Regions:
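Conserved phosphate-binding elements of NTP-dependent enzyme cores
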Residues: 1-945
Length: 945
């Protein structure tokens, strides 16, 4: 640190007096044009320095260059609590969050690769007729003249202009217009007819109408007449004519636009928007470019066909009640020879179809209906569809939504595009086939396709292919080769989203930029880590400063500079305990250095648990890239599911097993991916999925409210003498209810001040000074602390404060046990990271009583965790297993994998080359597998112990 400080400050980003969150008035120096890693315990202040100080100041300075109107539209950006920052260049933050919640957003649209593919197909794509499969052809009028003279020489022909193609209508007005223009004949549905006054067709039938422009014998001597006829026919037929050979009875189409000469099918002139599923010109007309449609699922309407209608077999209706709809259904059943008490499985196909889809037949008079009125019945399906109307309440729409299932669009089969767009080809591939290729295969296709193009096509495609090739190179380099351009951005993990943005930034070739990344190694297998580090160095070598908030050992050792924040978390952190090169770091005495140089380590358990002898078996999993996989999990053990990125870990656990169990135990609506059978489900009584989603959507949500310890704390305050004298109830101590909360800020602790043309400013409430409660409520104190003081305590402080209160201590202590001692009891959920939110949820489950038969599912719980935090987490997970539960973890971190009792390793690669279980067993057994990539890295880890 001193070395940089002594040099010219223009060589670094110099931060002086940073006090954001828990930072202790620190100075930090980040060298320009270097790869710097900021590390430290969870909650030590890494993100406070990188994102909340450096990035926030960079954004603030950028926004200040805008007009006051623009600043108001963008919202307020507070100045971070720092004395000064010098040497700051433009800042770009690449965080771990899903790129886009829009179902139309894909990897292709985010990275712009799909945009270049659209341009490529619009310029050199070869059109093929979707009717005949023949290449589409377009001509000039001169070429059409030459073709007709050559093909129909000395033959009698009709020159026709197609006007109506397979459409309903009487066309009375059309015939009258043609008659007034002087035309005598038309061909209607293949028959030649004279145009007469009042001529009309059957309006309910589909018709084909062609105008007879001329009837002549083709001859080179009369080419001028033919040329003029072609010009008139082209004008009347909107650029299309048909030449009908009278003797042979055959017609041939000619067009100035792309046309099928056999069927007359015409395509628009191709443009990039014709290949976009976000454009009306390119999108599938059925699904509007989404690739899927919501259809009513009969299995959701009738989940159990062994039940009767009377006993509630039709879920939307429930059990029998004496109402009109049940009397109508009773009428259908009686008509078909059944009753409401007949099991649904015994009803005829016709009866069930009428119950679901309705009938126009008159029903037996239901009770209460006069004999003069015999109502018809619309059906259950129609009733549910009516509830999806915008005019009904959102509650009714939500109710109806449970009976729908997203289904692949029956028209485009998930391709999102219309038929025309899907019938342009380059080297035998349409744009959807390319979008569905894995990025590694697409890169190979792009690298070789140029050689297969014609000379003119090569000239046109050269620059477009260069842009595509560049972007695919970077996407493959950051370990995303198993994904495809068609992959929805909504389905990406935080780590995948971050690496996509990283690849996009590298491809943009910007220089003199400060990039700040938040744990880019998340979700990445050890094998792919080298490629990620190489990409970051590539970004640095372009002339950029790269700052990475990271815990990965390889990333630290490969960096140019390391800043270690500590020594502990929360109030005991916030200091720069080390700054220097990785080599200097290894010799320092910090906690991080101890884990890097091997003096500290996470110990491997002396003995592996074998489980309780019971198993959970999942057979025939075939979702996404899974190859008919059978999964067997020993219960009562710590199980790790491992494998390279894209090998199928999340597919088999999060998208197959977890939804199956959630449906069984909680009637979840989420459908699992395809599987054949599950056995052993009776050996567990609960499934708990601990993910990284926020613990609440409102800033009012916090660890105290989520764990429900706040209810215990409020009950404690109610029992205090002062509260009893005043007659206070628990609601008095809630900041969500009127009475005890501050009436000025409504319990928020701050007020929003409108600044007209400037952004609104958030200021602490002048009445409660940010404490959320009114003066009377704050007068009730326990051990000298008010309810607001308690919420402002860290978990570590609260554990000491409530040490003699078992009901409160038990819930707070588990938060401390999972490494969250540094966060505040009342800390808004919006300020918690994904890893912190996950551990709050884990602590909440730990505080509950269990039967010892619970299955816990955790997806990368080490996200955001330092080596020391992982050691603490492993202690918590082992406690769960020791109580008889099963813990199932999807993880890449070798410190967790080496401590597992049982490993399921998937692979061998990602994407189409994955989807298999490569090896199962203890870590030692995985090390012996020749096919396991995880085993190769695990072997090194276990050998170093």
């Amino acid at each position: 640190m001193d070395k940089i400080k002594k040099n010219d400050e223009t060589d670094c980003v110099a931060v002086y007096g940073a006090r954001v969150h828990n930072l202790k008035n620190i100075d930090a120096f980040i060298p320009h044009d270097k790869l710097t890693v900021i590390t430290g315990l969870s909650g030590s202040g890494k993100s406070s320095l990188a994102f909340d100080t450096v990035y926030a100041e960079g954004q603030r300075r950028y926004i200040e260059t805008f007009s006051s109107y623009a600043r108001n539209m963008l919202g307020a950006l507070e100045r971070p609590d720092v004395d000064k920052i010098t040497g700051l260049c433009p800042v770009i933050s690449i965080e771990q969050k899903t790129v886009n919640k829009n179902p139309r957003s894909t990897i292709g649209t985010i990275t712009e690769v799909y945009d270049f593919l659209r341009l490529l197909f619009a310029r050199i794509g070869e059109a093929v007729s979707y009717k005949s499969g023949k290449p589409m052809i377009k001509y000039t009028e001169e070429q059409i003249l030459e073709l007709i003279l050559g093909k129909f020489d000395n033959q009698k022909v009709l020159i026709l202009s197609p006007l109506v193609n397979n459409r309903k209508g009487h066309y009375k007005e059309l015939f009258e217009q043609l008659r007034r223009k002087g035309y005598l004949n038309v061909r209607v549905d293949g028959e030649l007819q004279e145009i007469v006054v009042g001529m009309r067709l059957d309006r309910y039938k589909n018709h084909n109408i062609e105008l007879v422009v001329d009837k002549l014998k083709v001859s080179g001597k009369d080419s001028q007449r033919l040329k003029e006829t072609i010009a008139v026919a082209m004008k009347q037929g909107d650029g299309v004519i048909q030449v009908f050979d009278v003797e042979k009875g055959e017609g041939f189409f000619y067009s100035k636009s792309l046309m099928d000469p056999i069927t007359g099918l015409s395509y628009r002139e191709p443009a990039p928007h014709n290949f976009s599923f976000n454009s009306m010109q390119g999108a599938c007309p059925k699904c509007k470019g989404l690739g899927s449609v919501n259809l009513i699922d009969v299995d959701k309407i009738i989940p159990d066909k062994s039940k009767t209608i009377y006993s509630g077999g039709i879920l939307p209706l429930g059990s029998y009640s004496n109402n009109f709809i049940f009397s109508q259904i009773a009428g259908i059943c009686e008509k078909e020879g059944y009753s409401l008490k007949t099991p649904i499985k015994d009803l005829s196909e016709k009866a069930l179809d009428e119950i679901l889809n309705g009938t126009d037949e008159a029903l037996v008079n239901p009770a209460g209906i006069g004999r003069g009125y015999q109502p018809t019945y619309d059906g259950i399906v129609k009733y549910i569809e009516m509830q999806q109307n915008d005019e009904v309440s959102s509650k009714a729409q939500k109710w109806a939504g449970q009976f729908y299932t997203p289904t692949v669009c029956p028209v485009c089969h998930g391709a999102r595009l219309n038929r025309e767009a899907l019938h342009y080809f380059i080297d035998g591939k349409n744009i959807d086939e390319l979008a569905n290729m894995e990025l590694s295969d697409l890169k190979e296709w792009v690298d070789t396709v140029e050689q297969k193009l014609g000379k003119q096509q090569q000239v046109v495609a050269k620059e477009i292919l260069k842009e595509i090739r560049s972007r695919l190179h970077f996407l493959n380099d950051v370990g995303l080769d198993y994904l495809s351009l068609s992959r929805s951005s909504m389905s990406l993990s935080g780590g995948e989203s971050q690496r996509i943005r990283l690849a996009t930034q590298i491809g943009s070739q910007l220089v003199n930029v400060l990039y700040i990344l938040d744990e880019p190694s998340i979700g990445l297998h050890q094998r792919d880590n080298d490629r990620l580090i190489h990409s970051l160095k590539e970004l640095r070598d372009l002339g950029n400063t790269v700052v990475v908030v990271e815990h990965d050992k390889d990333m630290m050792l490969e960096s140019d500079y390391v800043i270690d924040i500590g020594p502990k978390a929360g109030r005991k952190g916030g200091k720069v305990v080390f700054a220097g090169t990785p080599e200097e770091m290894l010799k320092s005495g910090t906690l991080t250095a101890g884990y890097l140089n091997g003096s500290l380590k996470i110990e491997v358990p002396a003995k592996r648990r074998k489980g309780n002898g019971k198993k959970l078996t999942l057979r025939g999993c075939s979702g996404n890239n899974l190859k008919d996989v059978d999964l067997t999990l020993p219960l009562g053990a710590l199980i790790c599911v491992t494998g390279v990125s894209g090998s199928g870990k999340s597919t088999i656990i999060n998208e197959t097993l977890q939804p199956i169990l959630s449906q069984k135990f909680y009637r979840s609506l989420k459908e699992p991916l395809p599987y054949k059978a599950i056995k052993g489900i009776e050996n567990i009584d609960k499934v708990v999925s601990v993910d990284q989603a926020p613990i609440g959507k409102s800033p009012r949500s916090n660890p105290a409210t989520y764990t429900n310890v706040f209810a215990n704390i409020r009950n404690l305050f109610v029992e205090l003498p002062e509260a009893k004298i005043r007659g206070y109830k628990p609601g008095r101590f809630s900041f969500n209810m009127s009475g005890g909360r501050c009436d000025v800020c409504k319990g928020n602790g701050y007020r929003s001040i409108e600044m007209n043309f400037l952004p609104n400013v958030l200021v602490p409430c002048e009445a409660c000074h940010g404490q959320r409660y009114n003066r009377e409520t704050l007068e009730v104190r326990f051990k000298g602390k008010s309810i607001a003081d308690v919420l402002d305590m860290t978990i570590n402080q609260a554990v000491e404060f409530f040490e003699n209160m078992p009901s409160i201590l038990s819930k707070i202590k588990v938060l401390q046990d999972v490494g969250l001692g540094y966060i505040k009891l009342g800390q808004p959920s919006s300020t918690l990271s994904g890893g912190e939110s996950q551990r709050v949820k884990l602590a909440t489950e730990l505080s509950k009583k269990d039967t010892g038969k619970t299955l816990f599912i955790l997806d990368e719980p080490t996200t955001g965790l330092h080596f020391e935090d992982i050691r603490i987490l492993m202690g918590v997970l082992n406690k769960l297993v020791d109580r008889g539960n099963t813990v199932l973890v999807i993880e890449h971190n070798l410190d967790v994998i080496k401590c597992a009792d049982y490993i399921v390793d998937m692979g061998p690669e990602g994407g189409k080359n994955g989807g298999k279980i490569i090896a199962v067993g203890t870590p030692e057994e995985i090390c012996e597998s020749k096919d396991s990539i995880t085993g190769k890295f695990l072997r090194k880890e276990l050998m170093n112990l």
